From Swiss-Prot:
Belongs to the WD repeat ARPC1 family. It comes from Dictyostelium discoideum. PANTHER family: ACTIN-RELATED PROTEIN 2/3 COMPLEX SUBUNIT 1, ACTIN-RELATED PROTEIN 2_3 COMPLEX SUBUNIT. Component of the Arp2/3 complex composed of arpB/Arp2, arpC/Arp3, arcA/p41-arc, arcB/p34-arc, arcC/p21-arc, arcD/p20-arc and arcE/p16-arc. Interacts with carmil (via the region between the LRR domain and COOH-terminal proline-rich domain); carmil is required for Arp2/3-dependent actin nucleation. Arp2/3 complex, MyoB, MyoC, and the alpha and beta subunits of capping protein all form a larger complex with carmil. One of its GO terms (molecular function) is actin filament binding. PROSITE patterns: WD_REPEATS_2, WD_REPEATS_REGION. This is Actin-related protein 2/3 complex subunit 1. WD repeats lie at residues 8-47, 52-91, 141-180, 200-239, 322-365. Keywords: Actin-binding, Cell projection, Cytoplasm, Cytoskeleton, Repeat, WD repeat. It is found in: Cytoplasm, Cytoskeleton; Cell projection; Cytoplasm, Cytosol; Cytoplasm, Cell cortex.
Length: 369
């Protein structure tokens, strides 16, 4: 079995998301549109084009239970798309922001969602039945652009990463969405007040992700710092690791003790918990049939060659990795009980790659734990 399957669907992909049965994928080809591809035989063909946004689409999330697509854009808007009568119908979300929407995420129960923004705030959005629209409450404790958001499995806590170098955890309880009978993990915290705030990074915090159990929160920043906050203690303990690779743009828990990271190195890397979090190597050391990777990462080698040799001697050389440019997102493709057996990545090279974890383990001699 091949370690990966690759599809070239655009000249550049900035975000992608799958539907529940993985028969369709929604992606942004680096413009104001979202293209929905469907598998027909051995080929992927464009089935729908969502073109309501005016500027670059920054994020896509496809709810598996309700089959609703959530999109955000630099045009300061977010839309909830519902499939009806053979067409995707958009509903504008009332965000009330004056800067770009940077990232969106449905809550686990899909009764609300979070929108990160460049307006130094996060919108917690919920559906108001009496008005038939998606309204929002604002969390305003950030000092700069919010880059990523991620929901805790309990549907109440929300983690945010920001360009003010901090990671924050908020109680995002909304009475109209969550009801009155829920048990809030940290008591009656006022909406918008951070429960925890972490400042171990010295640069933009690009990515963060909760573990499947919600007991740990991993995040990474532009200065090469990777950290994990362990919430089994109170206050949480922080374990920090500085990876030698280029900065990570996105993270994914493969298991509770194994995390895949992607970014400017053009290859997924693995970090595992072996009595402490440690860098375990690249999951894509070289493409099948390609030259073996050296001691340096492929992306760093390419840029160094450009400096040493000039553009004409390196510009037309292919990287030894599957992706040929920065990887912008990583999402689970197949998972059972919090264990991911397959995951997909998309990048600025226009490729979507589905990776098979067991085949990667056999090929590259590493172990997911």
């Amino acid at each position: 079995m091949s370690a990966f399957e690759i599809e070239h669907l655009a000249s550049c992909i900035t975000a992608h998301a799958w539907n529940a049965d993985r028969s369709r994928v929604a992606l942004c080809p680096n413009n104001n549109e979202v293209h929905i591809y469907a598998k027909q035989g051995t080929s992927w063909v464009v089935e729908h084009v969502l073109a309501e946004h005016d500027q670059l689409v920054t994020s896509i999330d496809w709810a598996p239970k309700t089959n609703r697509i959530l999109t955000s854009s630099q045009d300061r808007n977010a839309y909830v798309w519902t499939f009806k009568d053979g067409q995707w119908k958009p509903v504008l979300v009332l965000l009330r922001i004056n800067r770009a929407a940077t990232h969106v995420k449905w809550s686990p129960q899909e009764n609300k969602f979070a929108v990160a923004t460049g307006a130094k705030l996060v919108c917690i959005c919920f559906f108001e039945e009496e008005h038939d629209w998606w309204a929002s409450n604002h969390i305003k404790k950030h000092k700069s652009t919010v880059l990523k958001v991620d929901w805790h499995p309990n549907n109440l806590l929300l983690a945010t990463s920001s360009s003010d170098y901090k990671v924050r955890v908020f109680d995002a309880y909304i009475k109209k969405a969550d009801g009155r009978s829920v048990t809030r993990p940290y008591g009656e915290v006022a909406f918008g007040e951070p429960v925890f705030e972490f400042d171990q990074c010295a640069s933009w915090v690009h990515a963060l992700k909760w573990s499947p159990s919600g007991s740990t929160l991993a995040y990474s920043s532009h200065d090469g710092v990777f950290a994990v906050a362990n919430f089994s203690t109170n206050p949480p303990t922080i374990e920090k690791l500085r990876v030698r690779n280029l900065p990570l743009r996105d993270l994914l828990y493969i298991t509770e003790n194994s995390i895949a990271g992607v970014g400017y190195d053009c290859a997924p890397l693995l970090i595992t918990n072996q009595n402490g979090w440690k860098y375990s190597g690249e999951m894509d050391k070289a493409s099948e049939g390609g030259a073996a990777a050296g001691s340096e990462t492929s992306a760093r080698k390419l840029f160094q060659n450009k400096v040493d040799l000039g553009e004409s001697k390196s510009a037309d050389k292919k990287l030894t990795t599957v992706h040929q440019n920065c990887i912008t997102s990583i999402v689970p493709f197949k998972s059972v009980g919090g264990v991911v057996s397959d995951f997909s990545t998309s990048g600025l090279d226009g490729n979507i790659v589905v990776w098979h974890v067991k085949a990667l383990e056999a090929k590259n001699k590493f172990k997911v734990i």
